[in-house]
Amino acid sequence: MAIRFFKAATPGTRHGSVLDFSEITHKKPEKALTSWWSRSKGRNNRGIITSRHRGGGHKRLYREIDFARAKVNVPAKVAYIEYDPNRNARIALVNYQDGEKKYILHPVGLQVGQTIIASPEASIAIGNCLPLVKIPLGTEVHNIELQPGSGGQLVRAAGTVAQIVAKEGTWASLRLPSGEVRLVSQNCWATIGRVGNIDAFNLTLGKAGRSRWLGRRPHVRGSAMNPVDHPHGGGEGRAPIGRARPVSPWGRPALGAKTRKRKKFSAALILQRRK
């Protein structure tokens, strides 16, 4: 999928770019697989902001994606490739032989009319889903489970891919897109191939308004605030932050400080930290 650059007709289009949507084969979503989604806008159940810089954005219908691929040994045919406003990857509508329809993440190379299947005995082909124990070393996979039966949780963003680098006992070592090497049970399932829309990372929004369409609000620097609002605030003119190292609005170390808990359960499963 190619990137289309705007002509410099206005300041908002001068540096903007969009994808050409050449892979899309159908515009309207499957009605039975959509639902109304009221976004939290960064608030918790009490209405308190727990994630800053979220809010607004265009209304969206949620597309129910089948991350679990739980219909085992039932072949499915790819009907359409569609746009999903809730993620940067494309989605594919598949029709199972028993008449059921599902959405899955669209991997690179999967075409309309192809047949895919989730089965321990499936071939190593794009879009097929298998347990890690059945997938050979060096294979590129995505939509990986963390626990057997939990549904895919790892490697779901556009253009991402993980690689199986080793197997020992009941564990498989995966190199994730972040560079982290992690152990995952060989009973977990994964889908063959790389997630599609690999050029999504190279897009330039071009103007602040496109961020607002996505539900992203302005990220104000702490040094531009008053002392009552942020530890970096205050001072005359462009003053330094007045501290040895930067901190968050709540006084915790920020901008480079490691925040992962040392005694986290999954620490034993991480063989190499992310880069």
Curated annotation (Swiss-Prot):
Pfam family, one: Ribosomal_L2_C
Domain of life: Eukaryota
MF terms in GO: rRNA binding; structural constituent of ribosome; transferase activity
Region (Disordered): 222-258
Keyword terms: Chloroplast, Plastid, Ribonucleoprotein, Ribosomal protein
Subunit structure of this chain's protein: Part of the 50S ribosomal subunit.
Identification of the protein by name: Large ribosomal subunit protein uL2c
Lineage: Eukaryota, Viridiplantae, Chlorophyta, core chlorophytes, Trebouxiophyceae
Gene behind the chain: rpl2
